[in-house]
From Swiss-Prot:
Name of protein: NAD(P)H-quinone oxidoreductase subunit K, chloroplastic
Organism: Agrostis stolonifera (Creeping bentgrass)
Cofactor(s) needed for function: [4Fe-4S] cluster
Alphabetically ordered keywords of this record: 4Fe-4S, Chloroplast, Iron, Iron-sulfur, Membrane, Metal-binding, NAD, NADP, Plastid, Plastoquinone, Quinone, Thylakoid, Translocase, Transport
Assembly information from the UniProt record: NDH is composed of at least 16 different subunits, 5 of which are encoded in the nucleus.
Catalytic activity as recorded in UniProt: a plastoquinone + NADH + (n+1) H(+)(in) = a plastoquinol + NAD(+) + n H(+)(out); a plastoquinone + NADPH + (n+1) H(+)(in) = a plastoquinol + NADP(+) + n H(+)(out)
Gene: ndhK
Pfam families given in the database record: Oxidored_q6
Compartments (UniProt record): Plastid, Chloroplast thylakoid membrane
Any one Gene Ontology molecular-function term assigned to this protein's record: iron ion binding
EC numbers on record: 7.1.1.-
Family: Belongs to the complex I 20 kDa subunit family.
One Gene Ontology term from the biological process aspect of the record: electron transport coupled proton transport
Membrane topology: Peripheral membrane protein
Length: 225
């Protein structure tokens, strides 16, 4: 029996009969056989690859990596996500069957990391594209931290009511019972916050009279506008 506690699995009789509910039985079977889709784009994924070895042995958690999103119920994003990759990531997530879960691994996936400071093509957080269940910070996180994130996800699944999760996601795709995200606009695919980015004006957009009028001070915003 799994070590994760269930509210109704500890009710046993003298005949060693376990009384439970279909929901708890479904949660127990799902948390013991997570099939992840590995979406690694950067160095954080190397730390997850070390779990495959005999030292950490992630097979004991029932993890079976899959190459198809239609056979996976967990997607693990590790590394930087760019705007050009955003449509592919959203499509992979939408092709996964319900119930499905997301683990964001590393600073670059959670906030954009160091590439988000001066990059125009980096998505500032994968949770702007798909709902995230477990955040795993670090640059990069250690394999022990990945195991801890998997344990937290398993505990979340054990206390989950499938009907509530399905009902909430049908109403709003980026809304879960764990973190209440309210979408203000549609999914960002390639044009994420383009209106907030500064683009230096070209000399062709500035008239010659304004450009060569150096004697009178002209504010920079007038040159742009």
């Amino acid at each position: 029996m799994n070590l994760i506690e269930f509210p109704l699995l500890d009710q046993t009789s003298s005949n060693s009969v376990i009384s439970t509910t279909p929901n708890d039985l479904s949660n127990w079977s799902r948390l013991s056989s997570l099939w992840p889709l590995l979406y690694g784009t950067s160095c954080c994924f190397i730390e997850f690859a070390s779990l495959i070895g005999s030292r950490f042995d992630f097979d004991r958690y029932g993890l079976v990596p899959r190459s198809s999103p239609r056979q996976a119920d967990l997607i693990l994003t590790a590394g930087t996500v760019t705007m050009k990759m955003a449509p592919s990531l959203v499509r992979l997530y939408e092709q996964m069957p319900e119930p499905k879960y997301v683990i964001a691994m590393g600073a670059c996936t959670i906030t954009g990391g160091m590439f988000s400071t001066d990059s125009y093509s980096t998505v500032r957080g994968v949770d702007k594209l798909i709902p995230v269940d477990v955040y795993l910070p670090g640059c990069p996180p250690k394999p022990e931290a990945v195991i801890d994130a998997l344990t937290k996800l398993r505990k979340k699944i054990s206390r989950e009511i499938v009907e509530d999760r399905t009902r909430s996601q049908n109403k709003n795709r980026c809304f879960t019972t764990s973190h209440k995200l309210y979408v203000r606009r549609s999914t960002h695919t390639g044009t994420y916050e383009q209106e907030l980015l500064y683009q230096s004006p070209s000399t062709l957009d500035i008239s010659s009279e304004t450009f060569f009028k150096s004697k009178s001070p002209v504010p920079s915003y007038k040159l742009v506008n």
